[in-house]
From Swiss-Prot:
Signal peptide: none annotated. The gene is Muted. It comes from the Eukaryota. Component of the biogenesis of lysosome-related organelles complex-1 (BLOC-1) involved in pigment granule biogenesis. Pfam families: Muted (PF14942). The lineage of its organism: Eukaryota, Metazoa, Ecdysozoa, Arthropoda, Hexapoda. InterPro entries: Bloc1s5 (IPR017243). GO terms for cellular component: BLOC-1 complex; transport vesicle. It comes from Drosophila melanogaster (Fruit fly). This is Biogenesis of lysosome-related organelles complex 1 subunit 5. Disulfide bonds: none annotated. Belongs to the BLOC1S5 family. Component of the biogenesis of lysosome-related organelles complex-1 (BLOC-1) composed of Blos1, Blos2, Blos3, Blos4, Dysb, Muted, Pldn and Snapin.
Length: 160
């Protein structure tokens, strides 16, 4: 009986540690927040890049139209602006292509996620095992108390 009480005491001592250990939950929330932030940010950045592409494209069209009608040094300046805008458009297109590339998580991050999932599964297994042990000990105690009570009734000749 003392052994069971000490086991229950040990389990009760571990309960606050198990209940108050929020690291797994907090890490999951941080990961979800970062993922949402990156997705939202990337969407807005891609939209801005498309707007820049449209603006640069329209400028290029306007510059090419102006350079066709221009004369003298103004035409040279427009030609130079046209090449610079073309380079800018190429840079924006390269940046868009780079933004579209799916980034995979690093192996270290994947290993950390796997380890976290394993720790969580182990924690849940241990928790379930602890619950079963406590429940079994309570059932055993109920049976012992019922036996003791029935023995006491027999000894005292009390009718049920």
């Amino acid at each position: 009986m003392k052994i069971m009480i000490s086991q229950v005491g040990r389990e009760l001592y571990k309960v606050p540690l198990r209940i108050l250990d929020h690291r797994v939950f907090v890490n999951g929330e941080i990961e979800a927040f970062l993922e949402n932030f990156e997705v939202r940010r990337n969407d807005s950045e891609v939209e801005k890049l498309f707007q820049v592409t449209e603006t640069v494209g329209s400028l290029k069209y306007d510059l090419s139209r102006c350079s066709a009608t221009g004369r003298g040094s103004g035409a040279e300046n427009l030609a130079q602006l046209d090449t610079e805008v073309s380079h800018l458009l190429d840079g924006v297109n390269a940046l868009l292509a780079k933004a579209k590339v799916e980034r995979t998580a690093s192996t270290q991050l994947q290993e950390a996620r796997l380890a976290r999932e394993q720790r969580r599964a182990e924690f849940l297994t241990n928790l379930e095992h602890g619950y079963r042990r406590i429940e079994n000990s309570f059932e055993e105690k109920e049976e012992e108390i019922a036996e003791l009570y029935s023995d006491l009734q027999l000894k005292l000749n009390i009718a049920k």
